[in-house]
Amino acid sequence: MSKKIRTEAVDYLFEAILSLKDKEECYTFFEDICTINELLSLSQRFEVAKMLREQKTYLEIAEKTGASTATISRVNRSLNYGNDGYDMGFERISLDEDEE
């Protein structure tokens, strides 16, 4: 059975996230809504995706991030067959850095 992601509750959560104004507000919000391990797992996946885009090996990624090869494989599958969400994030971060 496939879970439906597009729900009113998820929309409401995303609206709250989109309303955050700066990094400090993000820390405040995410420290309340996520456990430390959940937040660290999300950030680990993002770092893994960045390193995969930089053509790092699974061994290099595992050593630097502590991610399992299963996690690295899942992130790699998302990069190759997903909705391009990671790339959208990377592009926007890059644009923000270019403007500074």
Residue spans of the language-model regions?
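General nucleic-acid-binding
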Residues: 1-20
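Active-site anion-handling motifs in enzyme catalytic cores
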Residues: 17-21, 27, 100
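Residues at alpha-helix boundaries and the short loops/turns that link adjacent helices
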Residues: 20-24, 36, 55
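Short, Lys/Arg-enriched anionic-surface-contact patches
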Residues: 25-44
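Short, amphipathic alpha-helical "recognition" segments used to contact nucleic acids or chromatin
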Residues: 42-56
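Long, compositionally biased
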Residues: 53-60, 92-100
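Short alpha-helical "recognition helix" segments of helix-turn-helix
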Residues: 60-65, 72
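C-terminal structural segments of small proteins and small subunits
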Residues: 69-96
